[in-house]
């Protein structure tokens, strides 16, 4: 459960990301594909090379979804219901992949914002990404 301090940390951190969110989303996807090669199986039609337009576009989608989640941090299930349906029923993404992407998002944010990435912010973002992952996999059952 996200505490009020966690929510404040997430909102503050995401606010500093600003216009770089799509770029960071794409970088996190690239890290995920490199570190966890099995994740590539969900993107057989993508050019997965560094800087690919398709990875950039999907990174923007990831960032947009997370921006929406931050804006609706008190009601993640309703805010992410459509995405949960998509990933559970149409795409059938293995739930472990959300953990992989979450880890790579944390690494990416830590690389770009080392001063702001305090242990408290790290913990809050980790809890937030876990909460988002839980919502996205909630309809698998």
UniProtKB/Swiss-Prot annotation:
GO BP terms, alphabetized: hydrogen peroxide catabolic process
Binding positions for heme b per the UniProt entry: 87
Modification N6-acetyllysine occurs at: 16
Residue numbers of N6-succinyllysine PTMs: 7, 11, 16, 40
Domain Globin, residue spans: 1-141
GO molecular function: haptoglobin binding; heme binding; iron ion binding; organic acid binding; oxygen binding; oxygen carrier activity; peroxidase activity
Residue list for modification Phosphoserine: 3, 35, 49, 102, 124, 138
Pfam families from the UniProt entry: Globin
Alphabetized SUPFAM superfamilies for the sequence: Globin-like
Chain positions found as Phosphotyrosine: 24
Annotated positions binding O2: 58
Residue numbers bearing the Phosphothreonine modification: 108, 134, 137
Domain of life of the native organism: Eukaryota
Protein's UniProt name: Hemoglobin subunit alpha
Biological classification of the source: Eukaryota, Metazoa, Chordata, Craniata, Vertebrata
Gene (UniProt): HBA
